[in-house]
Amino acid sequence: MEKMTILETTDLKYTYPDGTLAIEDVSISIEKGKKIALVGPNGSGKSTLFLLLNGTLKPQEGEIIFHGKPLLYEKASLRDVRKSVGIVFQNSDDQIFAPTVYQDVAFGPINLEMPEEEVAAKVNETLEYVGLLELKDKPPHHLSGGQKKKVAIAGVVVMEPEVIILDEPLTSLDPVGADEILDLLNELNQFEKAIVISTHDIDFAYSWADYIYLLVNRKIIGSGTPEEIFRDPGMLKDAGLRIPMVLEIYYEIQKRNMASVNRVPKTVPEIVDTLKPPSLIWLDVPEGVKEGDKLDLGLYAEQLGEICSEGVVDTRVLHIHESGQAIVAVKRIRAGIGRVLIYDTDNYKLKEIKGLLASGDFDVVGAMGKKTKLIVESDNLKPDLTVGVIDKSILTALCGKNVLIFTGGGMVDHAVRRISDYCKKSGVRINVDVFNRETGEAQD
């Protein structure tokens, strides 16, 4: 993905008319396709910062740079930035005001003076995308909290923004509703939308975000990757934050010598992977090999001998003796890792689905994304996994079982990438195939 900064701020300061200081000296950067979390307590200035980012408020000091140019607070410039930077408020009722779902989502395109036919096409496409097309004529106040949140998101997505900002997007949602919103955000991110959220949920921010800003007492007191932020005790203390549950569990099992050291797991599958301590062997290594190097297994097949057939997937040099021999950590996996097949529901065919299910090749079936879930529900298919599908699929494959995942759109690439990233980090090889929409064949 091309690195491109869409929005950045330098030394922003904003004070409300009554003299209340909202933020000061705030500098952040938002890049294309990044997932960014602003973490901080209530009253720290997160909501005010969001209103500054799309030009709703104007800072008294500092400036906002939009595509490399200072934001001008005149009609044309504000129109451009508000089309490109959409905000979803914490309370959906503050944002939804039209008599019907359709009219609410159509508000933005109509204000852009789009032709009526184009408005209808965009709104219907967006409502179908978020799984609300069948509710388009309903009054929004008759909807559930999760449905209202989707209406608010749809009203932003229909404008085709580059940046989508969400204030506490998972607050007050039940686990299923929260998972559906998270699926939606991840899919939008696959289309290279920058997603910016505010949250109090440390575990969510740690596992989800690419980059984190800590906003405390109206100032940015720290920024970095989740690994950098949550492994810094001093920064966490200053921000009044605890460490994420995943890290807390890892540290406890590490203290008991039950886990590999110097790892930074972010998910349950990554914690599980730390519980596989390596074996130690001696190998003759050539000059130039250094401690910490990974070895090409093919070059040492003769020395490894039978060990190679026992599922060796990774080697790392721990120490090099003066004799030229090295102590090498050898990581193994047991035979029988399951596979994951992802069926792209953008070309859904019930006959194909029934054939896959009848084959008996799959032990567990999952479904991701609201649109996909509605499709499989309409055909009376009952997936085993509907929440946390990717992590649970990885864990299932590690137990030697095969998984079939139904999903569509950008979630196909998202699932492949997540599983592939796990494989790269862990050294465990899980075969992941996508069912080809054109030929009806699985492709790597």
From Swiss-Prot:
One of its GO terms (cellular component) is ATP-binding cassette (ABC) transporter complex. It is found in: Cell membrane. It is an enzyme of class 7 (translocase). This is Putative ABC transporter ATP-binding protein MA_0394. It is a peripheral membrane protein. It holds the Pfam family ABC_tran. GO terms for molecular function: ATP binding; ATP hydrolysis activity; ATPase-coupled transmembrane transporter activity. InterPro entries: AAA+_ATPase, ABC_transporter-like_ATP-bd, ABC_transporter-like_CS, ABC_transpr_CbiO/EcfA_su, Co_trans_ATP-bd, ECF_ABC_transporter_ATP-bd, P-loop_NTPase. Belongs to the ABC transporter superfamily. Keywords: ATP-binding, Cell membrane, Membrane, Nucleotide-binding, Translocase, Transport. ATP binds at residues 40-47. GO terms for biological process: cobalt ion transport. The keyword Cell membrane applies. Residues 7-242 form the ABC transporter domain. Its EC number is 7.-.-.-. Probably part of an ABC transporter complex. Responsible for energy coupling to the transport system.
